[in-house]
Amino acid sequence: MATKKTPVTDDAALPSFEDGVDLDQAIGDLRGVLKTDAEGSLSDFGDFGDFGSTDEVSTDNDLSAFGGGAADFAMDDFAAAPQVAGVKAPLGSGLSENMEMIMDIPIDVQIVLGTSRMLVSGLMSLEEGATIALDRKIGEPVEIMVNGRRIARGEITVLEDDDTRFGVKLIEVLSTRKA
């Protein structure tokens, strides 16, 4: 069976520029790059020499042939926080912003009362009012699952403020680390 292909519309294929300012800026940037490339004003990388040479490997740290700014680069502190427009970002600020985004992601938590195994014929013969026996007894802890992984165990309770609803009281939180 052939797959159904969705036609690409002009609106989906092109980025939308709400006003002409963004489009003019993008075109201007592209022209600048093309002009620089056409003039050949990009820095040379220097002569790499003979790679097949049997000469002894040089241990000098003169990297000026690789764009000229390498000496400054070699002395940079890699542990320093990144700078944007002259302002230093506090260490770990990106991590905390990402954590805030992650903490806002909704997840489904499943409470597993028990399981049952039956033949297809038994499943097909189920009718309204039938009782399915589970593999757990009354009072045994239930499993709390997230994404198919057991994260805790708990006891079924009735909510204090709403006696028409059930809840789960955690009795054991399992390690989240993979072995």
UniProtKB/Swiss-Prot annotation:
Alphabetically sorted, this entry's keywords are: Bacterial flagellum, Cell inner membrane, Cell membrane, Chemotaxis, Flagellar rotation, Membrane
Q: In what way does this protein cross or attach to the membrane? A: Peripheral membrane protein
Q: Where is the signal peptide?
A: none
Q: Does the keyword NADP apply?
A: no
Chief location of this protein?
Answer: membrane
Lineage top rank: taxon: Bacteria
What InterPro entries does the database record attribute to this sequence? Answer: FliN, FliN-like_C, FliN/MopA/SpaO, FliN_T3SS_HrcQb, SpoA-like_sf
Annotated GO molecular function terms are: cytoskeletal motor activity
Functionally, this protein is described as follows:
FliN is one of three proteins (FliG, FliN, FliM) that form the rotor-mounted switch complex (C ring), located at the base of the basal body. This complex interacts with the CheY and CheZ chemotaxis proteins, in addition to contacting components of the motor that determine the direction of flagellar rotation.
Q: Name one GO cellular component term.
A: plasma membrane
Please give the name of this protein. Flagellar motor switch protein FliN
Q: Which GO annotations describe the biological process of this protein?
A: bacterial-type flagellum-dependent cell motility; chemotaxis
Q: Where in the cell is it found?
A: Cell inner membrane; Bacterial flagellum basal body
**Claim: Membrane is one of the keywords in the record:** yes
List the SUPFAM superfamilies: Surface presentation of antigens (SPOA) (SSF101801)
Family label: Belongs to the FliN/MopA/SpaO family.
**Known Gene3D superfamilies for this protein?**
SpoA-like
TM segment ranges: none
What's the source species for this entry?
Agrobacterium fabrum (strain C58 / ATCC 33970)
